[in-house]
Amino acid sequence: MFYSCCVSIEPRDPASEPTPTPRRPLRKSQPRSFSQAQPLSWAQLESVLSGRGAGLRNLRAVGVGEGQRRTTSLDPAEAEGTGAEGASQKGITTPFAELHASSAYNFLRGASQPEQMVEAARELGLSALACVDRDGFYGAARFATAVAESGADLATVFGAELSLDVPLTVLCKGREGYTRLSRVIADARMADPDKDSVRYPSLPQLAEAAGGHWLVLLDWRRTDAQLVDFFGADNVVVELQHTMNPADADRNERLHALAVRHGLREIVSSAPTCATPKHSRLAGAKAALRERKDMAAAEPTTHPVGGSWLRSGEEMLQLAGDCEWLARAVETSVQVAEECAFTLDLVAPNLPHFPVPEGYTEMTWLRAITERGGAQRYGPRGSSAAANQAWATIDRELETIEQLGFPGYFLIVHDIVSFCHENNIFCQGRGSAANSAVCFALGITTVDAVASGLLFERFLSPERDGPPDIDLDIESGRREEAIQYVYSRYGRENAAQVANVITYRRRGATRDAGRALGYAPGQIDAWTRHPEQTPDVVQNLAEQMLDHPRHLGIHSGGMVICDRPIAQVVPTEWARMEGRSVVQWDKDDCAAVGLVKFDLLGLGMLEALHHAVDQVRAHRGREVELWRLDPTESEVYAMLSRADAVGVFQVESRAQMSTLPRLKPRTFYDLVVEVALIRPGPIQGGSVHPYIRRRNGLEPVTFDHPCLEPALTKTLGIPLFQEQLMQMAVDAAGFSGAEADTLRRAMGSKRSPQKMERLKKRFYQGLEAKNGIRGVVADRLWDKIVAFASYGFPESHSQSFASLVYYSAWFKYHYPAEFCVALLRAQPMGFYSPQSLLADARRHGVEVLPVDVNDSDVQVDAVASLATPPRTNRPTGVHGLGRGTGEPVGQIRLGLSGAGGVKGISAEVAERIVEARERIGRFTSVEDLSREAGLTVAHVEKLARAGALGSLGLTRRQAVWAAGVAATERPGMLPGTSGVHAPALPGMSAFEMVASELATTGVTTAEHPVQLLREYLDEWHLRPAPRGVHPGDAAPRGGAAVVTADSLLRVPDGTRVRVAGVVTHRQRPATAGGVVFFGLEDETGLANIVVSQGLWARQRAVALNAKILVVRGIVHNAEGAATVTADLLEQVETQLRPAGEIAGAHAGSRDFR
């Protein structure tokens, strides 16, 4: 191997070495004989190349060869006291600036997070650091934040590497250089709609764009001084490199000669792609992935040891040895850094000035429209005591808004909301904005903050750093209209969406680690399914990748707007979705630099509610205004208390439906609590069960300390909301409002564990100083706060969501047919599939009519019944909800397309069918349909198999036969001139009909699949068990019979039962300790199944793959909600042929969402 001649150990007597001095004097280069150097042993070489071993940092120059070429050696005598840890021990005095580093935000190039790079630079005593990314400033804000938070005396230099024919590294000279480079990168990325394309102008044009405000680095990849001709000698710096690459010496010699010839300054860099040697192997893995190779295949073009790392000034001088020009380059690096360094907050923008009517300022206009809206919401000033209280709150809020200079922010949000209202788009503000009476008066939120007693300070306070945060929920189907309105209103250059940095998670990291190490794709897939089988070498590499950025995504709805082109602050690029541009920073980075974010979030339930309002208007003749609904209807709360909540916003999950019968909500505030209760924060904080016990009078209301009573009284001494945790910090630990807000932000931040650790010491000190709280009580209080780092809700957020809970429950109770149609039209959304939603509607007395070319619309629709008042008697029961009796309370007709429609029939084809029917009247034959609607054979066959041709007098099999006629029928042909009449064909069995419906539409209209299997299931315990299921093999199973889901609540608690159904979902919550929860559905309703870790391991194949299950287990129903803790799972479709037909056509469950 060639490494052994380039990397060596120089034999010497450590005792004879002089004591290291802080700075070595420059001496003339004197070559030493390489014969005096001793080659590395194989063990040492392997240690270097693999990234292991204490001596990895301690490679130093041993001599200057011909032409002053440098080689390196491993110096055991200096093994101690070097590196990031030892550097500080030796008292570094050699200034050095690393100006060409790459963090992990240089995607698939850097191997250390910006925080790690900054920490290493601080320990090494660097004067300045530049973290450059390829074609962007992806990590610039996080780098700047890391430096600010570290407290290090480290200057920040910003730059980027541009993807020209030969890559060009550019450093910005201060703020002006940064804005010019950001603009150039944005133009290059936006020049082509292809997101992955970058089109830079020519070098002369780049030099013109720089205007003398860039320094360009001339490194080994360029062999001429062309850059000098375009940028000028003062703006070109030669970059020499010490990277442990054997080619460094020759490259540096050529570059030095070029610098001398043209009078250019020289700097030196280790071109680090990681912070410390231990990350170099990861750098090599990422480099291989970048080239779409494994590490072995990429070896010829990647770094010999994976990557280089940060080095101190002393180390760089050691590497320079006796070479004067290399040593001078260390010093010059600091001078160049001083020329370029600046802090990123200098580019912070402002919001655009909002256009207001003549004679108004932004503040006076905000007061005017608030006055108008407040009169509508609360009544005129002085009209009542309640109105006076509201106006006093509004005036106080407006004073704070004026004091902080945020009127423009509120005007922009109001403008977006007004656009939605004017265009009949449902929207509402949520989150902390619901704490504001001004937001309520402006129509931004639907929660009355005054009546609800919400604190404005949670939303906005004088101590707050930065603007408030208003999230707008917009009906998902029309959110794009609002986004495009923002682009058109404020300009494409001044508005963009916020990025979401996609980071490595366990499965993705395992995949990429396996690829980098050269394993076969099939083997890697197996490891992602069975993580416990992953080899240590893959696991170790994958562990290093976790949480590293992989690529750029797009935030679900965050937009930034500013008073100048955003590209002057951060480059923009095209998003994957057409018509959207995105900045290169996530929401935290945008906030850190002062870009104000507006969240325009798509919410499926708002779309569903809009459809529900439209359906009731069209088919019942009633205009429903959501905000006028009476929130006290006892029947609606009684329905929810029975866990009759399929399709109801936020409370339809397994956990929520198990909680509803125990909580028994009776008031709107109970819904507020219900929304907040089943969240990771309250669950991890141990709040759920104590609250319910106290709510039901089974446990006394107590407080950990009397000082907590003001904050926790309304939730019975149990913390549920973020506002309460803030108040606890103020009352118990003496936090200021600003400190409490900092704590609250740490709760919701992605980086909250680190931030909250820094607050812990302050919290404990405050507890003892103010209230004498210490020990177990102090720990308990801190644990409750830490639990909310897993995203507990703010109360204002729960208030907003509770409104949607009530609205959706109201529609479900009064108009079940229209509500089901609304949910189907808003798909995909929610917890349940269209099949489950329709099955639930049938259990509530709704008749589901099949798809038909003569009766169906493009989408599913309720059947008009203007004379029929809504039914107020609902089926009873829990889970199963009972079977509806009597006349149907409504009818649903499946559509030709969309949810419940015919698979393979697009909306465009469905519109052609409806248009043809409206033009000529009802279709009378397949030929008629095909000709007038211009359908293909494939279209007609799909309609035939779905039973959509039933009104033509054809069975499904006859219709499929007749579909071939469509091949010759086209518009303009004489009717009846083609085709052959279908012969007599046998009908389909009930099982075949259900399987056909599931295969073609994904839903059944009449019978639930399990209903057809009931006669088999009733005898399940009498049937022989297949081999391997029971010890008796072919002996009867024995034991409990199969019961229906709706009977589980009536079975004595602790009884062993069997229950059967179609698997609707599988869940493994992070807070459940590995337990998996199943949903089973039969013709009577839903059953909750608990599968332990052990049972999952024993029956993994059945548990993971079965579509229809018989579950044996113990019923737990003592608290009003029934669950079955499974001890045996049996896959029905493998044991009953009819079940196999159904399972083969079933779309499957919604797993692990």
Swiss-Prot record:
- Give the family per the record: Belongs to the DNA polymerase type-C family. DnaE2 subfamily.
- Residue numbers spanned by region Disordered: 1-39, 64-89
Encoding gene (name)? dnaE2
DNA repair as UniProt keyword: yes
**Enzyme Commission designation:** 2.7.7.7
Protein name per Swiss-Prot or TrEMBL = Error-prone DNA polymerase
Q: Which GO biological process annotations does it have?
A: DNA repair; DNA replication
Which is one Gene Ontology cellular component term of this protein?
A: cytoplasm
Q: What does this protein do?
A: DNA polymerase involved in damage-induced mutagenesis and translesion synthesis (TLS). It is not the major replicative DNA polymerase.
Tell whether Cytoplasm is among the UniProt keywords.
yes
